[in-house]
């Protein structure tokens, strides 16, 4: 038995969003107590600040494996050009907070370089870095859960994380990753707060290993103020 062929195209349904599928499967999430409540973000300005600098792991003649250990802290002063006149800051805002930081390692060594190695980066949020050294006999970040390896010296490497402000060097805790409760810091005219951080350990080589490091900082500002000088410098 044969059926007559349809002479029209079936109407396709509108594609459903993934969020809609989740809510249909879990209707209790629609309850006002659990659903996402949109909040006004008036007066908050999102910016992206970047800087690039060179970094060199110096050559060594020692043939036993060793690692050059270093650290990276982030300060908004390094990303903002200096102000002029009586206004010491070039950004007319009163408060800021750093949402995210992206660190990119761009290798610059020649491809004909014969030595190879394996380095590490680890996210350190409590300012408890391993002491800086040029020839440590082991990789100090090898057992860190946040460790990512760097095939040296030709591979591109990047890290993306939420830095934490160093508000008190005598304490060993940091603020949680919560957007609603993240602290707003005052944009100072003299020196701003350091944020931590990224620990690095590069395996030494008989050649110099050159990198261009590009740091991109995602910052939020609030309380726009054009008064010169600021209200409370």
UniProtKB/Swiss-Prot annotation:
User: In which domain of life is the source organism classified?
Assistant: Viruses
In the UniProt annotation, what is the result of changing residue 63 to T?
In strain: Isolate PCV/688
InterPro entries, per database record: Circovirus_capsid (IPR003383), Circovirus_capsid_sf (IPR038652)
Variant or mutagenesis effect after changing residue 215 to I: In strain: Isolate PCV/688
Q: Which GO terms describe its molecular function?
A: DNA binding
The record's subcellular location field reads: Host nucleus; Virion
Which coarse location class applies to the principal site listed for this UniProt protein? Answer: host cell
Residue ranges for the region (DNA-binding) are: 1-47
User: Outcome of mutating residue 134 to N, per the record?
Assistant: In strain: Isolate PCV/688
Which biological process terms from the Gene Ontology are attached to this UniProt entry?
Answer: receptor-mediated endocytosis of virus by host cell; symbiont-mediated perturbation of host microtubule cytoskeleton; viral capsid assembly; viral penetration into host nucleus; virion attachment to host cell
DNA-binding among keywords: yes
Kindly state which keywords UniProt assigns to this record, in alphabetical order: Capsid protein, Clathrin- and caveolin-independent endocytosis of virus by host, DNA-binding, Host nucleus, Host-virus interaction, T=1 icosahedral capsid protein, Viral attachment to host cell, Viral penetration into host cytoplasm, Viral penetration into host nucleus, Virion, Virus endocytosis by host, Virus entry into host cell
Where does the signal peptide begin and end? none
Q: Please give the residue ranges the record annotates as the region Nuclear localization signals.
A: 5-41
GO cellular component, as recorded:
host cell; host cell cytoplasm; host cell endosome; host cell nucleus; T=1 icosahedral viral capsid
Concerning Pfam families, the annotation shows: Circo_capsid (PF02443)
Q: What does the UniProt function comment say about this protein?
A: Self-assembles to form the virion icosahedral capsid with a T=1 symmetry. This very small capsid (17 - 22 nm in diameter) allows the virus to be very stable in the environment and resistant to some disinfectants, including detergents. Essential for the initial attachment to heparan sulfate moieties and chondroitin sulfate B of the host cell surface proteoglycans. After attachment, the virus is internalized in a clathrin-, caveolae- and dynamin-independent, actin and Rho-GTPase-mediated pathway and traffics to the nucleus.
Q: How does it assemble?
A: Homomultimer. Assembles in the nucleus, presumably in an immature form, then migrates to the cytoplasm once assembled as mature virion. Interacts with Rep; this interaction relocates Rep into the nucleus.
Q: Which family does it belong to?
A: Belongs to the circoviridae capsid protein family.
Q: Under which name does UniProt file this protein?
A: Capsid protein
> Which organism does this record belong to?
Porcine circovirus 2
- Gene (UniProt): Cap
